[in-house]
Amino acid sequence: VDAAKDYIATLPEDSARRDEAEIIPPFGASYEVFESTGITGFKYGHHYDGGETSIHADYSVDPEYERVMLKAYGADRTKEILTYNTHNTLFYPSLTIKSAIQNIRVVRPISVDRTIIETWSFRLKGAPESLLRRTLLYSRLINANGSMVGPDDLTAYFRVQQGLASTSNDWIEMHRNFGQDKDLGDRLV
């Protein structure tokens, strides 16, 4: 993360934007940054992280995509769409949508100690090729099992499986800030 930030700092103001240098740094954010994005939860475990902000909030908007959006929706609606940032939207138990980068991640347990994790990348209808290229780059940099972020997720999943296989406790504690929820009627934040 520091190397990406250092690289960005060396670029002249008028240099071409490098998606790699923009995608990586948010994943080195502090716990406080992640906590500040908030989680909105619904019945049955469905939830989304972020909304007003997320770790993706500072990604630049692809100029071609912005032009297409402005033409289709006008300035006000385009701004509304592009400034609503979620990190993950989870449809419990195993489907995660990353709308900021058009990915769907599916976690499919196939036995007590085996899981298949798939990432599906999508091209938005009418969106420019450059946006799809960025989505695929994100998948390689973040979700791949050889990436900087993917192994952390895979290790967490593996350790959950190990914990579930143990006989020491019936529960695995996976909550934080327990008891600080605010009930808004149709959802918790």
Model-predicted segments: where are they?
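C-terminal catalytic domain of Rieske-type non-heme iron oxygenases
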Residues: 1-189
